[in-house]
Every structure is written in structure tokens, then in C-alpha cells.
Amino acid sequence: MSTSHASPRETTEGTVYTVTGGDWDEVVQSAARADDERIVVNMGPQHPSTHGVLRLILEIDGETVTEARCGIGYLHTGIEKNLEYRTWTQGTTFVTRMDYLTPFFNEAAYCLGVEKLLGIDDQIPDRATIIRVLLMELNRLSSHLVAIATGGMELGATTIMIYGFRDRELILDIYELITGLRMNHAYIRPGGLAQDLPPGAVDQIREFVKKMNKNLPEYDKLATGNPIFKARMQDVGYLDLAGCMALGATGPVLRSTGLPHDLRKTQPYCGYETYDFDVPTADTCDSYGRFLIRLEEMRQSLRIVEQCLDRLQPGPVMVADKKIAWPAQLALGPDGLGNSLDHIKKIMGTSMEALIHHFKLVTEGFRVPPAQVYTAVESPKGELGVHVVSDGGTRPFRVHFRDPSFTNLQAMAAMCEGGQVADVIVAVASIDPVMGGVDR
């Protein structure tokens, strides 16, 4: 017999049962025996601790969660569909808005896929690749700072929240200097970067690294030296290696089980195999282990950022192929709009053909050979994969993202059922889902 499930509902005509499977008489008896304490609670979608518009449907018996489900889709933006109506280069401005806390990873994954389809992945200038790694590691820092800050705030640790956002602000200032924006950068483009690092950027990053190395021990003291913080996180949101494998969980959730799986080591991209860093793991399988992993990953990211700064050499930041490359070495003109004479000369040259080519490249875009490819990068939340399909045109036929927040959120039920209602928030915070990435 299939397992039965009944939910009784009182109406003006008596009790109405909604039933799936099972024998009718047994269903009515089991529903009649249902405990008075059993209650269904909606946590979200506007609950302050649901990390955006996440809805959690909890069935609770007293203080214990007996069943937990996620309701997603409140932040659906149709980004994957929109990409099918834009050129390959314009796609960057869309993907950067998915997981809005890790924009550089979205852009990098997408651009690596497009470059692989074009067959130019070995022609990307070294300087562009190093700057990509630099920005991704700064982004890993800023994402983990938000995870730790919001996670602390939900436990009532407001100091750690203030510290987290204070340090993240320094990173956002660096983004603003380099890309002009604090988020939604569209800075990584197919073939390279939108433009080179501005004067003063390297010095500002070095200053930040120095400050951050000094500030990181504060998080250690605030959190690991705080018995209340530890008591609220230890043995909460438990998910072992078998559970992670079954659910496809990646990132800190997977590494908290002791498996050192990091795509930067297992499937290196952007030259990560040449950088010296460690993959932190824990063996606790709980929220506290994930917190410690994020803390240690921030230290490793600072190491990689320092190595990037030491490697930077002058050079181009866009491929030489004029059929693909948008103008990237731009200078700001006297009108403040980038319309400098050098810039105009570079586009127009002295021939009408050069201007026609530039016009076609920007309006129509370049063609990508018909093929499909899957590329993945290690985002702060786990494996961010992108499946890009081209039909030979100037626009993608299909772009699908494997967002780590979406996959990891499936583990919510396994982490929460059987635990306390108060621990649900801690478990969700340890996954660190961003709904922009989940719903896309």
C-alpha cells in the first residue's frame, strides 16, 4: 500500500479531507488521531531572516519541526530566457544580476563558457586572467563577510554583523574604483575585461589586504571565543557526506563533512593551479563547521589576492581578435564620457570599414560556432556551473545555470526535520542561499 497523507480542513459543511494514497478509513482514523499540537507555520517570504524572499513551510509539533519544505520563485527574473534575445556580450549584464552577492563568479562562469565555444580560451591575455582571479577572490571575501554578518545577526550577535558589513564596504569601494559600480558590474566580458585597472587600484587593494589581515582575528575572537555563539551553532543543521552526495550539495556545506572538494584544485580554471592556497575542511558536518570554513577561506583568499598583485604585468586585457574584441583600452575624454580623441581614432581608424565593423560588432555581435559546453567555477557557495548552447548565431540558443544556492537549499529539509524551530534559521544561514541565484 502506498503511504497515505491526509490534511483535514474545517468548512461550513464539516471536515474536508485532502488525501493522497492509502485506504480511506485508515486515513480518516489517522487524521482524527492527529495531535492537537501539530501546526503548520509559514516562515517567510518576508520574514527578516529568510535571506531575501524565501518561504519555509514548517509543520511543527510543539517546538519540534516534523516536516520542512521550501517555497521558492518569488524573485524569478527570467534571466536565462532573456539571454536568448541578447548578443553574447550583452549576456554579461544579465548574468551578473543573478546571485547579486557574487556577480564576478556569474560573469566568469558565463564568459569562460563562451570563450570555450569560440575556441579562444588559450588566447585570453595573462593580465586579464590575473585580474579575473583577483576580483573573484575579493568577491569570495565580500560574500563570506555577508554570510558571517547576517548569520551572526540572526543569532543576536550584532557586533559580528557590524564588523562584517564594515569590512565588506572596503571591498565595495575597490569594486567601485575598478568597475564604476558596487554591484552588477558586467566587467568580465567574453575575450577579457571591459577595461584595465585604473590608477591607484593596486595600492588600494594592498591597503585593504593589510587591514583585513589585521581584522580577521576579531571574527575568531567574537565567534569562536563566544560560548553562546558556539552552543547555537554546534550540532545544528547536521548533514553528513552521504547526505551531501545524495543531494548534490557543494561548497562549505560539502567541505564541512571533511571532503576537500574545491573546483579550483580538482578542475582548475583561470590558472588556479599556479596559485598557492589550501582548501579548508571540517569534520563536524554542522553549521559551526561551515562557519569556520568560511572564516579560513577568507584567509586563503587574501593569500591569493597578494599573489595576484605580485604577478600583475603591463599588457592588454582583451583578446587581439578584432572580430570578437570590444574596445577595452579606453581613456576618459575631457567631456568625462570616455569620448577621448584617442578612443574615437581607435574605433574609426582612418577607414570607413573599421567604423562599419565596430558598429556591427556592437549592434549585431559576433557569431559563435554551433556547439554546447559546460563550465564550472567554485563560487563562495559551491559549484556554479553554466551550460551554454550555441546554434551558430549571434545570440545564445540556451544558457542554463547550475546555481549552488538552488542545489544546496534542497538540503534544508534534511537539516531541519527533527530539530527545533529556532534552529531552522541557523541551518538556513549556514547554507547561505541568495534568492537571486535560486530563482533566476
Curated annotation (Swiss-Prot):
Gene Ontology terms for molecular function: NAD binding; NADH:ubiquinone reductase (non-electrogenic) activity; quinone binding
Record keyword Cell membrane present: yes
Enzyme class name: translocase
Keywords: Cell membrane, Membrane, NAD, Quinone, Translocase, Transport
Cellular-component GO terms for this entry: plasma membrane
Top-rank lineage group of the source organism: Bacteria
SUPFAM superfamilies registered for this protein in UniProt: HydB/Nqo4-like (SSF56762)
Reactions performed catalytically: a quinone + NADH + 5 H(+)(in) = a quinol + NAD(+) + 4 H(+)(out)
EC numbers, comma separated: 7.1.1.-
Protein localization: Cell membrane
Pfam families: Complex1_49kDa (PF00346)
Matches recorded under InterPro entries: NADH_Q_OxRdtase_suD, NADH_UbQ_OxRdtase_49kDa_CS, NDH1_su_D/H, NiFe-Hase_large
Record's bilayer topology term: Peripheral membrane protein
Biological function: NDH-1 shuttles electrons from NADH, via FMN and iron-sulfur (Fe-S) centers, to quinones in the respiratory chain. The immediate electron acceptor for the enzyme in this species is believed to be a menaquinone. Couples the redox reaction to proton translocation (for every two electrons transferred, four hydrogen ions are translocated across the cytoplasmic membrane), and thus conserves the redox energy in a proton gradient.
UniProt subunit comment: NDH-1 is composed of 14 different subunits. Subunits NuoB, C, D, E, F, and G constitute the peripheral sector of the complex.
Similarity annotation: Belongs to the complex I 49 kDa subunit family.
Identification of the protein by name: NADH-quinone oxidoreductase subunit D 2
Organism field: Streptomyces coelicolor (strain ATCC BAA-471 / A3(2) / M145)
Gene that encodes the chain: nuoD2
